[in-house]
Amino acid sequence: MHWAAAVAIFFIVVTKFLQYTNKYHEKWISKFAPGNELSKKYLAKVKERHELKEFNNSISAQDNYAKWTKNNRKLDSLDKEINNLKDEIQSENKAFQAHLHKLRLLALTVPFFVFKIMYGKTPVYKLSSSTSTLFPTFVSGVWSQGWLYVLLHPLRTISQKWHIMEGKFGASKFDDMALQSVSLGIWVWALMNVINGVEFIVKQLFLTPKMEAPASVETQEEKALDAVDDAIILD
């Protein structure tokens, strides 16, 4: 396997792993986010409030009015603390998620994009001369040079006909040897389409819940016919 293809597969595997495990990210983030200590404090306050509420419900407000009132004031104070802690946790988790998104962008998305731009025309798969001749030159050109060939092919035709900039778009730029290969950009594009196709099939066959048939709704005409039938029977 060509080294460029191996690097591309690495980026794709990491990207797909993050995509498939997306529903677990929030749980993972909660373990490493700065708000973890706040979460412990939040849970402790919730537990304290629950115990105090149960104790207050177990005593008589008339017989222990002073204590019951004091506990009620403390419950109000705990409610405010719990709400403030909840807001702080959500704020810190959002900030942490934003940092992770930037990290993913800088460490994965941008490097993969730059890699495809720099090495997009690198041949990663060689075609035999007999195989390459089975397809039109235009198709082989797209395989070897990428989608840019769609724009360059007309320019190449014009340059050959009018002898304009032959060094840029002529035969020397797209020789027969160069057209007998598949470039990294097209190879990655084809691989991603295959993966997406398999994902779609698996999702439709195994992961999509079955929809029940809609209940039949009696139309106005059917109701009218039923009414006529009933009238005939009564007569």
UniProtKB/Swiss-Prot annotation:
The keyword Transport applies. Keywords: Coiled coil, Endoplasmic reticulum, ER-Golgi transport, Golgi apparatus, Membrane, Mitochondrion, Transmembrane, Transmembrane helix, Transport. InterPro entries: Get1, Get1_fungi, Helix_hairpin_bin_sf. The keyword Transmembrane helix applies. Its main location: endoplasmic reticulum. Residues 1, 126-181 are lumenal. GO terms for cellular component: endoplasmic reticulum; endoplasmic reticulum membrane; GET complex; Golgi membrane; mitochondrial membrane; mitochondrion. GO terms for molecular function: protein transmembrane transporter activity; protein-membrane adaptor activity. GO terms for biological process: establishment of protein localization to endoplasmic reticulum membrane; mitophagy; protein insertion into ER membrane; retrograde vesicle-mediated transport, Golgi to endoplasmic reticulum; tail-anchored membrane protein insertion into ER membrane. The chain crosses the membrane at residues 2-21, 105-125, 182-198. Residues 22-104, 199-235 are cytoplasmic. It is found in: Endoplasmic reticulum membrane; Golgi apparatus membrane; Mitochondrion membrane. Residues 68-104 form a coiled coil. It is a multi-pass membrane protein. It comes from the Eukaryota. Belongs to the WRB/GET1 family. Component of the Golgi to ER traffic (GET) complex, which is composed of GET1, GET2 and GET3. Within the complex, GET1 and GET2 form a heterotetramer which is stabilized by phosphatidylinositol binding and which binds to the GET3 homodimer. Required for the post-translational delivery of tail-anchored (TA) proteins to the endoplasmic reticulum. Together with GET2, acts as a membrane receptor for soluble GET3, which recognizes and selectively binds the transmembrane domain of TA proteins in the cytosol. The GET complex cooperates with the HDEL receptor ERD2 to mediate the ATP-dependent retrieval of resident ER proteins that contain a C-terminal H-D-E-L retention signal from the Golgi to the ER. Involved in mitochondrial distribution and morphology. Present with 2250 molecules/cell in log phase SD medium. This is Golgi to ER traffic protein 1. It comes from Saccharomyces cerevisiae (strain ATCC 204508 / S288c) (Baker's yeast).
